[in-house]
Structure formats: C-alpha cells, structure tokens
Amino acid sequence: MLLEAVRTGYENALTSDIWTMELANRSFKAHVDNMVLDMAARLVLVNMLADDKHIALSDSELADCTARADAFYDEHSEDIAYIKKDELEKLFAMMVLSDKVYDELTRSVDTQVSVDEARVIRIQYIYSDKSGDASSKVEKLEKALEEFQAGEDFTALVSKYSDIPDYTAQIGRGELEKSFEDAAFNLDAGQISDIVSCTNGWYLIYCIDDNVTGKAESQIESIIQRRRNEQFEKHLGDFSDGVELIIDDRQWEKLSSQE
C-alpha cells in the first residue's frame, strides 16, 4: 500500500511521464521504489524500537486506529483491493505507534533557545569554487575584500568576482556549514568577513541585517524540532546497530514489478 500511495502521489503531481525519466542513471520508478522500501524498513525498525523501549498503543489508541483504517478501507476498497482490511489496520497501528515512539523519546529535549541562537540574519556573499588553482581563487577574494574596504559596493563586487549568480541568503543557526555560519553570525550589519574556507570553496560574507525582525518564533520552533530529530535519530541509530533486517528480494521484486 505504501508503494502504491507514493507512486500515485508522484504521478498525480508530475503526470505519468515521470516513469520514463532517469535520475542519477537510474529510472525514476526504481528511485521511488527504493525510497518506499527504505520507508517500510524504517517503519518496521521504529516499531521494533517501540517494543525495546516498552512503548505501546493504549486500548483507546488501538480502537481509534482500527476505526480510521476501516473507514479508509470502506471508502477506498476498490482502489486497494490488493490489501486485506486486517492488514490495513495493522499498517495504521504501526504508523501511529511510530509517531508515539517519536513523541515519547523526544519528550526530554531542551526547549530553551537563547535570543542569540534564535536570530535569523540576511547576508550577501561572494563565492569562489575549488576548481582550478586554489591560490588564484583565494587571491580573487582578497582583491574583492580590498576593493570593498576601499569603498566599492558589495553587489558590484559579486558580479565581478563570484562564481555563482545567487548571492543573497537569509539563514538561521544550524542550517549551513559551521565555518560559514560562525563567520556570518559574528558580523554586525554592514560588516564583511575575512575569507571563509568551506568544504565546497571560499566565501566573503557581507551582513545586511544581523537580526531579521519577525523570524524568532519560527526559528525557535525549527531549532527545537531539529533537536528532537537529532535525539530520535540517536535512539534509533543506537538500537539499529544490533538489528539486521532481511528483505525477501523475490517478494519485493514481485511487488515492485506490479504496475
């Protein structure tokens, strides 16, 4: 059912032509099918984690799952004739339990976010990629820095020196590479950074606004959600180290070959 639902969603959004497309030298269909297999394996793994952590659905939660599954089955029975009602009930229960495991294991996450951590800033940057001679790439940014300090407009310098046309961004903490982030958040509005080395190249960063108004609340929510995700993935990763899931390749091939 997961496979059919995901396939249908993609087809409704992008038309049936997507199945003739290729993505990274692999058919889009194979890409979607493998994604669904990963989703199914993760669902099973999280339910195993629930058992390990002694987390279970209450009687009322199970009854609600059954009612929702039955209602869905009755409404869509012609479209999902390939699945039995009790199998659908089990799938609904597994998904709800997966959500409950997430909530239970992330309940202790620290929800305190400092004013500085919640800041969102608006920046411009000049980027020099790592192709070619590194010293000449860095020298190019040194020239840009000298010209800015001599009074040249930063936007004009972007057009003159940057390897990419995009040069403006609005960022929060934890979104970009640490060296870039540290340099950007240490700037006050109107200041420019030294040359920043990142894994994909070098940057000069100019701060337009060091605290964009109206963004703190959504940024706090984003930071807390990221903390929850990190904590849950730590639990799941520690548990999965001792688990081996065996996929029945013949059954999966049979299922995924169905149109």
Where are these regions (language model features)?
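Hydrophobic (often cysteine-bearing) scaffold residues that line and stabilize catalytic clefts
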Residues: 29, 33, 37-38, 42, ...
